[in-house]
């Protein structure tokens, strides 16, 4: 009988990215690189050089997995499944120049945003609000007052708790402030909003810096900051303002022996830069980060590899396709907005026409009533005139009889005279009535003339209200304009104890010409200034932190991230090493 085949032993692994959880089953022989490759293949990431797998070791410290060692032989905290985090280990010097894929952009954006919200990266209040507006654009797209009603952002984590605690503002007030700036980003793609977020965030002093507790030869407790631009030394109580800096271009070798860490400058006249870490494992981490950052620093200053060139070409194609799709969408949105605007115009005009018709109808009725009253008055006047004429005729007959009857008896004559007087009084009374009615009729005739004028105006207004003028027809030129718009339309390896670095004395320190985005962009500068003024009205100074005070003093003295880096890199290497020893 043959020997039974040994069953393969698999371990369950859970890898948490910034926006997903992945589960794998690995063998005892699986290396860190094999697991890493499986992760990046699953999520479609090609810019692998920025990232690593992080785990909590048996002592509770966060550690980066070693790519060329078996996963099971590393000090991973036991559990089922084994827990790992997929995180950015190295940061680009300039996100706009280096990040190629959308997935890379998204992972960096989510990691940096989380670091800002948890206060791992200090961010001043006004910048926090502006960044929040880009975060909302990245998540929700364009602001829409119909969909994004008050309270819409209540469950979104948008600001560091420190910023909220420092200002006497309600949730609604915070939302209003963020929404005001959110509306400024209308038409911006979600990926562009993430990029704008990172372009602002990379100017923050603590962005992309890994801090390590160290001591100099005097035993002074300090911080060592390792980032994409070099090494910086910070005083223990200030991680915002480095005091001494060494760019990667000045360093030719890094090594450590036990807890002693040695950095050899290119300038052979300069003494070694020596510091001490509390534990050997810290020195291993420092060395690994220095190696990776230095390699990327040098790689940026060489021509792109074929792989990177292909990635950039593909990214450009995808961006162009997305841009064309965006333009189509914007055209469709613009057409919809125009249609909605015209619909509103027609509704407003229809309402105006209705009101004009009602007013005209009322004027017409009033004019008709006036004419009817005049006609009645004219009839009464004519009746009075006819009656007056009849009485006058009767009076003439009576007078004639009086003149002809000279032989009439006295009594009879007296009676006739009395009748004549009575008739004269009656005629006089009727004449007065006719005179009054005549005056009233003239007044009414004037009113009728006015009424007829109003009637004509009302009829003309009624006709105008029911007729659409030519300028309300759709302009075909709009479609021509739309047609024109449519047509216009790189894994790091690590070695223990010592590492010689590639050097190039001709490399110019990138910090020399670097400026913050706010310094280069007047609009951003004005936005931050306006936000700072608005927030100052509700600020609670009693809640100010040590970092707030340091930041305020730096601003007062006109310092920013790159001005400080330029300042602390001045002078020769020996002077800066001596300065470090004397801290």
UniProtKB/Swiss-Prot annotation:
It is found in: Cell junction, Adherens junction; Cell projection, Microvillus; Cell projection, Rhabdomere; Cell membrane. The keyword Cell membrane applies. Residues 466-518, 539-558 are annotated as: Disordered. Residues 476-485 have a biased composition (Acidic residues). InterPro entries: Band_41_domain (IPR019749), ERM (IPR011174), ERM_C_dom (IPR011259), ERM_FERM_C (IPR041789), ERM_helical (IPR046810), Ez/rad/moesin-like (IPR000798), FERM/acyl-CoA-bd_prot_sf (IPR014352), FERM_2 (IPR035963). GO terms for molecular function: actin binding. Pfam families: ERM_C, ERM_helical, FERM_C, FERM_M, FERM_N. Its main location: other. Residues 11-301 form the FERM domain. The keyword Cytoplasm applies. The modification Phosphothreonine is found at residue 564. It is a peripheral membrane protein. GO terms for cellular component: adherens junction; cytoplasm; cytoskeleton; microvillus; plasma membrane; rhabdomere. CDD domains: FERM_B-lobe, FERM_C_ERM, FERM_F1_ERM. SUPFAM superfamilies: Moesin tail domain (SSF48678), PH domain-like (SSF50729), Second domain of FERM (SSF47031), Ubiquitin-like (SSF54236). Interacts with cytoskeletal actin. Involved in connections of major cytoskeletal structures to the plasma membrane. This is Moesin/ezrin/radixin homolog 1. It comes from Aedes aegypti.
